[in-house]
Amino acid sequence: MQSKRPIIIGIAGGSGSGKTTIAHEIYDQLQQDDHILIMTQDSYYKNNDNLSMADRKKINYDHPDAFDMPLLVEQLRQLMDYKAVEMPVYDFTAHTRSEKTIHTEPADIIILEGILVLGEENLRDLMSIKVFVDTDDDIRFIRRLERDTQERGRSVESVINQYLATVKPMYNQFIEPTKRYADIIVPEGGENDVAIDMLTTKIRSVLSTVK
């Protein structure tokens, strides 16, 4: 029976804001002292294998309904109980969940990053520290364009069309408003070394109270 529970750090912000960079900066600074797990909300998009490819491409991936939040909460709670989980893998080329899973062991620090990780109360309630990464719209778009064309096999035109049709409106409607739930707001994303250092100091402080 474990006498303590992992601490959960939620990192939210728009696509391309620097969430992943910050998560890995924290990992690099703390990994020598603690076992750390990074989880991404992108892994928990709903399984769309019942839809045609044409219909999958029409899905609004920046809307809260695109995510399998019950599964995310369930697996996060299992990890908090120090139980391993089979984490889903999302295939961004096929626009659906892969048949593969990743066997994931629990850790003392769990960093959960994603556009809407602060959007649901039952998920926020599991977090010890809530972070919102606030980055200029133009910078976020350029980063998303580079990522989706280089890593996800997208065309420039499709990325631009998606940004104008869903990404920007969904950011304004659903993502940016979750900033009010954050304990810490990090401007300029992964480029803000001072904020990242302050964040790791805060995490160490929280850790010292549960060890």
UniProtKB/Swiss-Prot annotation:
Matching SUPFAM superfamilies: P-loop containing nucleoside triphosphate hydrolases (SSF52540)
Domain of life: Bacteria
Subcellular location(s) of the protein: Cytoplasm
Gene3D superfamilies found in the cross-reference section: P-loop containing nucleotide triphosphate hydrolases (3.40.50.300)
Cellular component, GO, one term: cytoplasm
Pathways involved: Pyrimidine metabolism; CTP biosynthesis via salvage pathway; CTP from cytidine: step 1/3; Pyrimidine metabolism; UMP biosynthesis via salvage pathway; UMP from uridine: step 1/1
NCBIfam families: PRK05480.1, udk
Protein name: Uridine kinase
A molecular function (GO) term: uridine kinase activity
Catalytic activity: uridine + ATP = UMP + ADP + H(+); cytidine + ATP = CMP + ADP + H(+)
Binding residues annotated for ATP, in chain numbering: 13-20
Organism of provenance: Lactobacillus johnsonii (strain CNCM I-12250 / La1 / NCC 533)
UniProt KW keywords: ATP-binding, Cytoplasm, Kinase, Nucleotide-binding, Transferase
BP GO annotations: CTP salvage; UMP salvage
Presence of the UniProt keyword Cytoplasm in the record: yes
Family label: Belongs to the uridine kinase family.
Top EC category: transferase
Pfam families (alphabetical): PRK (PF00485)
InterPro entries: AAA+_ATPase (IPR003593), P-loop_NTPase (IPR027417), PRK/URK (IPR006083), Uridine_kinase (IPR026008), Uridine_kinase-like (IPR000764)
Enzyme Commission number(s) from the entry: 2.7.1.48
Keyword Lyase recorded: no
